Structures are given as structure tokens and as C-alpha cells.
Regions:
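HAD-like aspartate-dependent phosphatase fold
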Residues: 1-21, 26, 30-308
Length: 308
């Protein structure tokens, strides 16, 4: 952790409060997609949900995700070059002005040497820039309308899973300041930071954040892909990055890997359950629910008692 990051952390805790760091899984936690495609979401309702309809919705999402990945985020070029986070190759980026850079004509190939690592770093920087600007600059209005309708249809089919998960983020995060470090863009009154650690590839995961309206809360610096390194390694990076006694961590997901990683670091873990009668799903789980998990490991804080 460099001096600048250390100062940012000190700023966040300058009022003496604690900072809660939520480490989220994506599929079947903040969003539903895999369980729509394989039918497990609908099947959990024992016949009251149309499995075929869920599959149709999932396939529509897949189509849009892959198209935006390829058309706007260089995925055809870098699909086989997955990195755990966008800044992983920053040391190779010389800061070149990319406004007129021709990504189609730079002879990019597998980044086994410094030159191609620099070219991949350029692409990552361009992806980060597009991500922070959101969808409207590179998606035509007709497509935006289609995506808005698909979101509404999905939210209705899943009994408000998507909007409820987003409401959770709204309740405990209020982004007021733009920041390039993924830390100081959090309203200090909330003292919460949200980080995504997904088993999906990095570029499609960033696109999912955009399409499922999560990018307001998940800056590109806070999105990690664990495919090649595992969730425990990602969790360790996060712990090192936010290394301060006032920071508290909690992992939230539906899988065994994030559970094991959280246990290894002695973090609380909230298990998401698809079953309709579970309170550990969306709608259902709230910041107050998670505050009990924080308290069980770290003890009570003013932030816990203020959760509603």
C-alpha cells in the first residue's frame, strides 16, 4: 500500500468510525443469470415459475453481454488474456494518449512480452475509461430502451431480485465524489465500500455491472476476476489494499469458494440462498441483516446500531 492510498484510508476513518467493506459475488448474488440459464432459479419454486421463460430471459442477457463485450470492450482481441483486475498491468502502461490510437492496427498478440503487455494495458485503460462513463456514450437509444425493458422484465420474473439487490447498495452507499482510486468515491456518512470478486472473466463481468446498473457502486478498481488466481488470493489483495484497523470485511455470495476464502481470513460470510422461503436472498437480506454478521466477528459499532 503506497503513501497516497494510506492517506485515503486515514481520511475515511478520520471521524473515528469504522468502514465496512462488502465483498460481493456476482451471479446468484447481486444478479441472477446462471440460474436462469440452467433452470435452477425457476425449479426452486416447484412449478410456479416458468422455466422456459427464465431460460429465454437468460439467453437475451447473454446475447447483449457478448455483443457489448465484442463491440465496445475489445473482447474478441483479449478474451484469452484474462487478468484479475484492470490495473494489473499498470506498470507497463506508459501513459500514451489513446484518443487517436488504432487498436485494430497495432498488431496485438498474446501478451508474453513487454510490448504486448503494454498494448493490453492500453486496452484495459480504455475499458476503464468507457466503464466510468457508463453505457449511454456508446449504446444507441434504441438499444438502451431494449436493455431497460429487459431489466424490468427480469426484475418482475425474479420478484424484484435485481432492484432489491441494488436497493441494498443504495441504502449503505451514497456516491458523492468521483475518484480514480475506488476508495474516496464513498459518502463518508455511510462508511461503506463495495467490491466485486467474481468467478467470471473480467471484461464480461464489467459489462454485467453496466447492464445490471451496478457500476454506480462498483468502480472498475473494485472489480476482480478470480478465474486464474482463486477467490482467496483476491480476498488477500483486498485485505492488503484496505489494511487499516478500522476497516471491517464481510463476504457475501452463494458459493463454497468465497465461503472458504472468508473463513481463511476470519471474515464473516453471508450465504445467499435461492430458495423462495429464505430470508437470505433478494428481496429479504438487508444491511441490518449483514450488520449482525459484522457484529458477530468484530463486535458492535455505531454503524451497526444505525442500520435499519
Amino acid at each position: 500500500m503506497n503513501d497516497n492510498t494510506s492517506k485515503k484510508l486515514e481520511t475515511l476513518v478520520s471521524d473515528g468510525g469504522t468502514v465496512n467493506v462488502y465483498i460481493w459475488d456476482m451471479d446468484e448474488t447481486l444478479i441472477l443469470l446462471r440460474s436462469l440459464l440452467n433452470g435452477t432459479y425457476a425449479e426452486s419454486f416447484n412449478g410456479s415459475k416458468d422455466v422456459k421463460r427464465g431460460l429465454e430471459i437468460g439467453k437475451m442477457w447473454e446475447k447483449h453481454i457478448l455483443k457489448i463485450c465484442d463491440d465496445c470492450f475489445f473482447y474478441e482481441q483479449i478474451e484469452d488474456c484474462n487478468e484479475p483486475f484492470l490495473d494489473s498491468l499498470r506498470q507497463y502502461d506508459d501513459g500514451k494518449d489513446l484518443s487517436r490510437y488504432d487498436f485494430k492496427q497495432d498488431d496485438f498478440s498474446t501478451p508474453t512480452d513487454d510490448l504486448n503487455k503494454r498494448k493490453l494495458a492500453y486496452r484495459h485503460r480504455a475499458v476503464a475509461d468507457k466503464y466510468e462513463k457508463g453505457l449511454p456514450p456508446f449504446i444507441v437509444s434504441e438499444t438502451m430502451s431494449v436493455l431497460d425493458e429487459l431489466y424490468s422484465v427480469t426484475d418482475e420474473y425474479t420478484d424484484r431480485w435485481l432492484s432489491s439487490a441494488r436497493d441494498f447498495l443504495v441504502q449503505c452507499s451514497s456516491v458523492k465524489e468521483e475518484s480514480g482510486d475506488g476508495i474516496s468515491a464513498i459518502d463518508k456518512s455511510s462508511q461503506d465500500i463495495h467490491i466485486l470478486v467474481t468467478s467470471g472473466a473480467l471484461i464480461p463481468s464489467l459489462v454485467k455491472c453496466l447492464l445490471f446498473r451496478l457500476d454506480t457502486f462498483l468502480k472498475h478498481e473494485n472489480v476482480y476476476s478470480s478465474i486464474d488466481v482463486g477467490k482467496l488470493q483476491c480476498f488477500k489483495w483486498i485485505k492488503e489494499r484496505f489494511n487499516h484497523p478500522k476497516f471491517r470485511f464481510c463476504a457475501i455470495g452463494d458459493g463454497w469458494e468465497e465461503c472458504a476464502a472468508a473463513q481463511a481470513l476470519q471474515w464473516p460470510f453471508v450465504k445467499i440462498d435461492l430458495q423462495p422461503d429464505s430470508s437470505h436472498r433478494f428481496p429479504g437480506i438487508t444491511p441490518k441483516t449483514v450488520s449482525y454478521y459484522f457484529a458477530a466477528v468484530y463486535g458492535n459499532s455505531d454503524a451497526d446500531t444505525s442500520k435499519e
